[in-house]
């Protein structure tokens, strides 16, 4: 395989990393989790988790990736000098990214389907339940989603992924601001924003904390190499703490603005904010269908969602592609064909899981989507974050001094020595406690 590719600019690195973080986790999963967990209460815990858990983990991921100059498949083995069994977690990172795309690409296909329906004026002729139980719709839009992603990735890094992501992220921010301004004009804006932004401390429970932590890791794509791959594409001219803060701020702003767009509309048209995964589909489609000029507002809304979803699909597929190419030595085009076919076949489990390939992994009503989401969000990401902290802070792995040197190389904000207890003790202990609490609660459901 050719020498390692590089991103063309600092802006490209920030936009690409933010694009991977900003996706369905912000515009699909965050609003309905917020609605089901008390609105402002969930928001408060979520922001705390981003700062005290997500930020240190992101800095560690970028550092490991930049130091190793390899994909997550080999970075642990390379930096540990072959000690221990760290190479096994590289394999888990590959499995985790494939499992993520197995349901993420399907959800992205749903968003693309809704965009096409609104754009073509067919927004009255479909529904969420009808869509997910129609095999031809799910399979077709899954195929289109992955085809778009791997065609873009088949070009070299700067001319394909970096350039497209810059355009998509810029368009996404503009669309979100237009939609947010419109939401402020709705009659239910005050009530919706009050529910969304004002915390009610009586609603903060253990389940809310677990959900907020899992959502923080899910949206930042940390714990299984989602950020490390982009760290491997940049030089050492900027320190990684400042870059991580910029990315988290962008990610959080998109999540917050998504709620500002959605909750005023829900309260204006008296729709249920606890609708769950269908909130962004049936609920918002109903809102737009009853709104003056709703077809065009709906088109803009789902176009912004397409950009958000595709930015993450591209990031995850790039990670899978990089690992497979390092494993096989294939060129970008050849790797794209193989990875595209493999991801499509695995994602068929989710696409057909609501109809002809029905599977209930946990309880009545659960599907393949729940299985893949549980595997990635509730297990691989938090466990990966614990192992990453151990790897970066203890001699059994890479070690604190080497991590600190890498994280602080270049201009910008530095990780301070007094922060060591946060990285070494607080992050792994807090994540482990919340993870075990969540597993116990899950087992007793």
What residues fall within each predicted segment?
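Membrane-interface "cap" regions at the ends of multi-pass membrane proteins
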Residues: 1-29, 57-62, 66-88, 235-239, ...
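Membrane-embedded translocation segments of transport machinery
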Residues: 2-3, 7, 162, 166-310, ...
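Inter-helical loop and helix-membrane interface segments of multi-pass membrane transporters/permeases
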Residues: 3-5, 32-37, 67-92, 105-160, ...
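Loop-to-transmembrane helix boundary motifs in multi-pass membrane proteins
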Residues: 6, 12-14, 20, 136-140, ...
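Select transmembrane alpha-helical segments in multipass membrane proteins
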Residues: 6-17, 42-45, 84-98, 142-145, ...
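Transmembrane helix-boundary motif of multi-pass solute transporters/channels
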Residues: 11-49, 226-231, 241-245, 249-252, ...
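Helix-loop-helix connectors at the membrane interface of multi-pass transporters/channels
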Residues: 74, 108-133, 234-237, 242, ...
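C-terminal membrane-solvent junction of multi-pass transporters and transport-like membrane proteins
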Residues: 88-97, 328-342, 371-431
């Amino acid at each position: 395989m050719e020498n390692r590719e590089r991103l063309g600019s600092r802006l490209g690195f920030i936009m690409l990393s933010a694009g991977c973080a900003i996706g369905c986790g912000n515009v699909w999963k965050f609003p309905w989790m917020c609605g089901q967990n008390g609105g402002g209460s969930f928001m408060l815990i979520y922001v705390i988790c981003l700062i005290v858990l997500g930020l240190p983990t992101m800095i560690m991921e970028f550092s490991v990736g930049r130091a190793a100059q390899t994909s997550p498949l080999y970075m642990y083995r390379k930096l540990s000098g072959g000690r221990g069994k760290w190479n096994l977690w590289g394999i888990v990172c590959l499995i985790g990214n494939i499992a993520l795309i197995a349901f993420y690409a399907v959800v992205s296909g749903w968003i693309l389907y809704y965009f096409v329906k609104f754009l073509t004026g067919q927004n009255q002729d479909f529904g969420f339940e009808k869509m997910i139980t129609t095999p031809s719709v799910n399979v077709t839009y899954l195929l289109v989603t992955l085809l778009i992603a791997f065609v873009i990735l088949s070009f070299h890094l700067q001319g394909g992924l970096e350039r497209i992501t810059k355009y998509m992220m810029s368009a996404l921010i503009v669309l979100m601001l237009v939609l947010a301004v419109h939401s402020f004009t709705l009659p239910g804006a005050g009530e919706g924003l009050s529910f969304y932004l004002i915390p009610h401390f009586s609603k903060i429970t253990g389940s809310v904390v677990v959900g907020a932590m899992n959502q923080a890791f899910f949206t930042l794509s940390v714990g299984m190499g989602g950020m490390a791959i982009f760290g491997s594409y940049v030089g050492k001219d900027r320190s990684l703490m400042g870059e991580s803060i910029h990315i988290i701020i962008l990610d959080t702003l998109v999540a917050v603005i998504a709620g500002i767009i959605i909750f005023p509309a829900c309260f204006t048209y008296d729709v249920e904010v606890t609708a769950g995964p269908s909130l962004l589909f049936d609920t918002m489609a109903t809102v737009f269908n009853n709104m003056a000029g709703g077809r065009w507002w709906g088109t803009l809304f789902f176009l912004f969602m397409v950009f958000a979803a595709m930015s993450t699909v591209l990031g995850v597929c790039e990670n899978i592609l990089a690992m497979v190419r390092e494993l096989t030595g294939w060129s970008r085009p050849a790797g794209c064909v193989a990875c595209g076919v493999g991801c499509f076949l695995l994602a068929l489990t989710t696409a057909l899981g609501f109809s002809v390939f029905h599977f209930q992994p946990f309880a009545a009503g659960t599907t393949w989507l729940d299985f893949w989401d549980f595997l990635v969000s509730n297990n691989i990401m938090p466990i990966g974050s614990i192992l990453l902290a151990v790897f970066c802070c203890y001699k059994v792995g890479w070690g604190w001094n080497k991590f600190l040197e890498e994280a602080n190389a270049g201009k910008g904000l530095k990780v301070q020595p007094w922060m060591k207890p946060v990285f070494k003790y607080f992050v792994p202990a807090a994540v482990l406690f919340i993870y075990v609490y969540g597993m116990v609660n899950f087992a007793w459901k």
